[in-house]
Amino acid sequence: MAPKLQWPIVTELTTASASRGAATGSRGVAPAVPRGGAPADVAHPQTIKSFVRRAGRTTAAQARAFEDLGPRFVVPYAPIAPIAPIAPAAPAAGAWFGRDAPLVLEIGFGMGEATAHIARVRPQDDFLCCEVHRPGVGALLKRIAEHGLTNIRILEHDAVEVIDHMLPESCLAGVHIFFPDPWHKSRHHKRRLIQPPLVARLAARLQAGGYLHCATDWQPYAEQMLQVLGAEPLLRNTAPGFAPKPGYRPLTKFENRGLRLGHGVRDLVFERRH
């Protein structure tokens, strides 16, 4: 049995796994009140970074993709409420995509391989994808052009600020968080992305019946995810424990490399209660 864990508050969110060479870099926001499993006697620091900035080179092709496709597919960060989290309201997704369709948020897409695949196999859904690693954004823009995708929009901004100030409650049909940085060392576990404050924020923004899908190849992190998600009162597990891999999520180059190294991959799919 995994040891009982204590959860510090996280106010800055990673947007991709460090092992994928991702980067983030924006200021934190005021911490949320933890719920669903955070012990009352835990000290909650004002700001705990869940990432470090890593350099990355944008290729000429990625730069061209920014120039040609950025105006259409990269959404500017425009907070509705710059101080307090926004109240329930209609999201701006209809204006972003030009249609009314189920909206899925992705936090951290690396180089966009899985994102583009999922958008292809689920053309009925729209995908709002947060990533601040510019080479990754450029790579996804290239994939959008290559596959003629129209149901992806990118926000090159810190995900927590997007969640707090651009997404109203009950606006999301789903959330994808695939292979976030596991922060292997014990002293860095406080920096892990999947912790009660973030999960509570996301659960509040899911529609009834909406889902939160996480995946990781680090077993201790998978167990932590299972405990944190299971403690959120607005969510229920769709499986007895870890879930079978949903058919829409592909095996990426990153994941196949992990499997060759003997890293088992765990999926977790939780649903917003009605």
Curated annotation (Swiss-Prot):
<feature type="binding site">
    <location>
        <position position="181"/>
    </location>
    <ligand>
        <name>S-adenosyl-L-methionine</name>
    </ligand>
</feature>
<dbReference type="InterPro" id="IPR003358">
    <property type="entry name" value="tRNA_(Gua-N-7)_MeTrfase_Trmb"/>
</dbReference>
<protein>
    <recommendedName>
        <fullName>tRNA (guanine-N(7)-)-methyltransferase</fullName>
        <ecNumber>2.1.1.33</ecNumber>
    </recommendedName>
</protein>
<keyword id="KW-0949">S-adenosyl-L-methionine</keyword>
<dbReference type="InterPro" id="IPR029063">
    <property type="entry name" value="SAM-dependent_MTases_sf"/>
</dbReference>
<dbReference type="Pfam" id="PF02390">
    <property type="entry name" value="Methyltransf_4"/>
</dbReference>
<feature type="binding site">
    <location>
        <position position="131"/>
    </location>
    <ligand>
        <name>S-adenosyl-L-methionine</name>
    </ligand>
</feature>
<comment type="similarity">
    <text>Belongs to the class I-like SAM-binding methyltransferase superfamily. TrmB family.</text>
</comment>
<feature type="active site">
    <location>
        <position position="181"/>
    </location>
</feature>
<comment type="function">
    <text>Catalyzes the formation of N(7)-methylguanine at position 46 (m7G46) in tRNA.</text>
</comment>
<dbReference type="InterPro" id="IPR055361">
    <property type="entry name" value="tRNA_methyltr_TrmB_bact"/>
</dbReference>
<feature type="binding site">
    <location>
        <begin position="252"/>
        <end position="255"/>
    </location>
    <ligand>
        <name>substrate</name>
    </ligand>
</feature>
<keyword id="KW-0489">Methyltransferase</keyword>
<feature type="binding site">
    <location>
        <position position="158"/>
    </location>
    <ligand>
        <name>S-adenosyl-L-methionine</name>
    </ligand>
</feature>
<feature type="region of interest" description="Disordered">
    <location>
        <begin position="16"/>
        <end position="40"/>
    </location>
</feature>
<dbReference type="GO" id="GO:0008176">
    <property type="term" value="F:tRNA (guanine(46)-N7)-methyltransferase activity"/>
</dbReference>
<dbReference type="GO" id="GO:0043527">
    <property type="term" value="C:tRNA methyltransferase complex"/>
</dbReference>
<keyword id="KW-0819">tRNA processing</keyword>
<feature type="binding site">
    <location>
        <position position="106"/>
    </location>
    <ligand>
        <name>S-adenosyl-L-methionine</name>
    </ligand>
</feature>
<keyword id="KW-0808">Transferase</keyword>
<feature type="binding site">
    <location>
        <position position="217"/>
    </location>
    <ligand>
        <name>substrate</name>
    </ligand>
</feature>
<comment type="pathway">
    <text>tRNA modification; N(7)-methylguanine-tRNA biosynthesis.</text>
</comment>
<feature type="binding site">
    <location>
        <position position="185"/>
    </location>
    <ligand>
        <name>substrate</name>
    </ligand>
</feature>
